[in-house]
């Protein structure tokens, strides 16, 4: 956006009090540091910085995602590192979780598992989650309201249910796309799918 103001919990974000900042957990891309630690060590390290730390939330997610407690972060895949970062965010026990492309590196199965877990967690713990994602289908069960933007301009802003009721998606399979007239063939997706 090129104008306006941003307020969180009633405060301007540029002049926010430290006590208000404690209520916010932020996850950005490429988010795991201290890769020489294992998941137990990094949990203990982070816990010292957050007064409302909830280690049960961290370890519950690690168990659900089957991440071994002594596993070194440096030996983890990108997806596993994302899982650790997500656990650290949940353990901060913040009122507002801001997740920027949280699913980067997670395969579809783990994305689905984490999305389900996040939905249950937010409801049970009464948390607000603000997230961005390029994978819309994962968000249908998680998001109440949706804003679709294009280079800072809002294209659509409405509740997800209303958005889904407004638009319909069709998929057509063409057995022989090479037999379509030349000028029509370019309008169809590659691999015979529309």
Regions found by a protein language model. Give the residues of each.
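ABC-family P-loop ATPase nucleotide-binding domains
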Residues: 22, 28-84
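Helix N-cap at the start of a conserved alpha-helix in ABC-type nucleotide-binding domains
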Residues: 108-110
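Catalytic Walker B motif of ABC-type/P-loop ATPase nucleotide-binding domains
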Residues: 97-101
């Amino acid at each position: 956006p090129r104008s306006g103001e941003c307020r969180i919990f009633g405060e301007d974000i540029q002049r926010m009090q430290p006590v208000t900042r404690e209520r916010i957990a932020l996850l950005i891309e490429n988010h795991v540091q201290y890769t020489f630690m294992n998941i137990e060590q990094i949990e203990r390290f982070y816990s010292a910085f957050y007064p409302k730390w909830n280690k049960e939330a961290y370890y519950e997610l690690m168990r659900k995602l089957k991440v071994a407690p002594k596993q070194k972060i440096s030996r983890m895949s990108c997806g596993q590192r994302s899982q650790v970062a997500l656990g650290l965010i949940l353990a901060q026990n913040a009122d507002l979780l801001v997740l920027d492309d949280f699913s980067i590196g997670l395969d579809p199965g783990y994305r689905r598992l984490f999305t389900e877990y996040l939905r249950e967690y937010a409801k049970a713990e009464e948390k607000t989650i603000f997230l961005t994602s390029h994978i819309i289908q994962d968000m249908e069960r998680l998001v109440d309201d949706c804003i679709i933007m294009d280079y800072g301009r809002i294209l659509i802003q409405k509740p997800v249910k209303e958005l889904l009721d407004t638009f319909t998606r069709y998929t057509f399979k063409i057995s022989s796309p090479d037999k379509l007239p030349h000028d029509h063939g370019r309008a169809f997706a590659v691999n015979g799918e529309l």
